[in-house]
A protein has these predicted regions:
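Non-catalytic accessory regions of SAM-dependent methyltransferases
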Residues: 1-133
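Extended active-site and interfacial segments that coordinate phosphate-rich ligands
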Residues: 70-80, 143-156
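Non-catalytic substrate-recognition/targeting regions of SAM-dependent transferases
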Residues: 117-130, 146-217, 225
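Conserved hydrophobic/aromatic pocket- or pore-lining residues that grip, position, or stack substrates
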Residues: 134, 204, 223, 240
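Carbohydrate-binding surface patches
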Residues: 136-140
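Conserved SAM/SAH cofactor-binding pocket of Class I
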Residues: 224-254
């Protein structure tokens, strides 16, 4: 397993964030993003990404998130309405809840690749988890997740064991010194990145180490099904193909 140990304890480094009136409304409404322009003050304001941001209204805690000084979305909100201890239990609970929401996919033998975590929709802003058969691909859209990466992997393995874990990073996310980077295998044996999987019975493949996103656009599954249904008896030319998923769906439908 690659070294994904924390370079600091996020719980020991906290930023006290006091939002503007507009920012406070956003936090109270459950908005997963708190922008830099909606922050009146942050103390201290020089802590690294991944530090715990505690949002205050006067002296009352109204929300908790992850501090991201390199992004205009300065706080990725994890909780609103009070305090939250950012600890491994939180990741286990959220990954479990996300998995429960996808119960129809997990046990479907005709679909062996699916999105486990879809960022903000699952209470984990800037984090995506896609599972291809027995390989888990973690995509970071924010450097704030780096200090928590080891705990995220441990939580994922506790909830649903994977033989291999691969890290992907958005272009704007730079790994800390000596930390694993885009395309690195964090758990399991090394491989070239190409995997074969099923999507509603169609055999597809993706390069999860170098391909776009996590290798394939798993969130487009329903759209591929719609395209296939619309191609009955038609001749179709796919001129903007990436991994060929829409072309395969069209061929199967036509």
């Amino acid at each position: 397993m690659a070294d994904v140990s924390q370079t600091f304890d996020p719980q020991s480094r906290r930023v006290a964030v006091r939002p503007t009136a507009a920012g406070l409304r956003a936090v109270r409404s459950g908005d997963p993003w708190l922008f830099d322009g909606s922050i009146a003050s942050a103390d201290p304001n020089d802590l690294p990404a991944g530090s715990v941001a505690v949002v205050f209204d006067d002296r009352r805690v109204v929300g908790v998130g992850l501090w991201d000084p390199e992004s205009p979305i300065r706080v990725k909100m994890l909780h609103s309405g009070g305090a939250l201890a950012v600890e491994p239990r939180v990741w286990v609970d959220r990954l479990t809840a996300a998995l429960d929401r996808r119960h129809g996919l997990v046990d479907d033998p005709l679909t062996t690749a699916w999105r486990w975590v879809h960022g903000e929709n699952d209470g984990l802003p800037g984090l995506v988890l896609d599972r291809y058969v027995d390989t888990l691909v973690i995509k970071l859209y924010s450097g704030a997740w780096y200090p928590h990466l080891g705990d995220i992997i441990a939580a994922a393995q506790k909830v649903l064991q994977s033989e291999r874990v691969v890290l992907r990073c958005a272009r704007r996310v730079s790994p800390p010194a000596d930390a694993p980077g885009d395309g690195d295998v964090l758990v399991g044996s090394q491989f070239d990145g190409t995997l074969t999987y099923l999507e509603r019975g169609l055999t597809m493949s993706a390069d999860v180490r170098r391909g776009n996103k996590t290798g394939a656009f798993l969130d487009q599954r329903d759209n591929r099904t719609l395209v296939g249904a619309a191609c009955d008896g038609a001749r179709v030319l796919d001129v903007f193909t990436a991994t060929g998923g829409f072309a395969l769906a069209a061929a199967a439908g036509g």
